[in-house]
């Protein structure tokens, strides 16, 4: 059973590791920059990052390895690929190497790194041989809710999108949502600004949207139809 850790506790853990990263690369909190998850995993945590085809249907995005083990992936043509992984390996599906997958790739690396952070800090509570992350956040591959996966997702989000960095990006982008209402439309300049924020931070639209909702910058779900869209295209 994974140790109970609140969102606030996970945020505090992330903050300490971000401080290590900033100190290592000479970054100041007064002029914050997003962490590069590959550099973070390698330089701060001492992890070995590999990119390999993990499955034929994309349901496995990444693996976290705590002890020597073998893994068999079945490719689209039916070929079976057997790999031997070592402790402190994190393996990302090579399909995420594409530029269009930057946000998903970065979050997956941060997610797998988060598993190692938790295993390092709480060795009696974490550290299964192989941990797989599926498409559905906060759930195991078999669809059952997983407390450990929620913690890894939350810690990953705190590493990539700490509050101080998001606030700096909000100021940089001149984002203004007085009522917390966002239209997912090019007619809303805030939507474009948030997309630019996501690109600078290196996360997906979904990730930055959820983070802004958690910070209560956005209230509720984005509305798909902007009033100007109705004027332009009709109801």
Which residue ranges define each predicted feature?
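Active-site hotspot residues in diverse enzymes, especially metal/ion-binding acidic/histidine motifs
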Residues: 1-235
